[in-house]
Amino acid sequence: SYTEYPECLNVASDSAGNTLLIKQKDFISCYSPETGSFQDVHVRGMNEEVSKVLFAEGERQFFIFDADGCLLEICPDFDSFPLALDIRKTPIHEKKIDRAYYLDGILYYVDMENRFYSYRMKDRQKKYLADLTCWMNQYGNLSRIALFHSTPYLVFRNGLLLNIDNQEEALGFDVGLFCVLPDRKQDILWVGTDGQGVRMYYDKYNRFSGIQLKSLPIVMRNPVRSIY
């Protein structure tokens, strides 16, 4: 954790432990294990609202997908003093961006017209996936996206789990949903609910079971906001 940047959500680290985060307006904060501290680099116009997602693709290679639909490649030079950032901007979408996620080498994003796209970083291939308007009108905004069996599963805030490749079998809930996490060792997708514990989704059997909050060894009455 970074105590000097409380409640920071825009943070990414590469395999060497180099870390970039966005918390302060007009700055990108950079950490290197060699120095053991953060340096704040001025980047005009940068803030938490502009940066829809921040992620690392390789050592000392970071990307920001911004609200204007531009992909910013950021390569920090930790050997220079003061620290310098090489920033290259590439427009990849013509509409404003609502939200974005990065999963296993692929950038997923929803624009302000509720169109859902993927952008494969390896070969810079953009693909239209779906129009989410009808789902968002009924179930609210996206809470999270997860890959399960290499397929994007979309979690909607007001109670919907949607397999983007099989929308006819969308699973509705009578409770709000906050988060989702694929199990690394079992064929299970964990879904955190608003006050009804954690649900387990078995894709093989196309069914759910659950763990209620009262069954946990600790007293917990709040919604499940995240799963690790």
Regions found by a protein language model. Name each.
Residues 1-228:
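Carboxylate-rich, polar loop motifs that coordinate divalent cations or form catalytic acidic clusters
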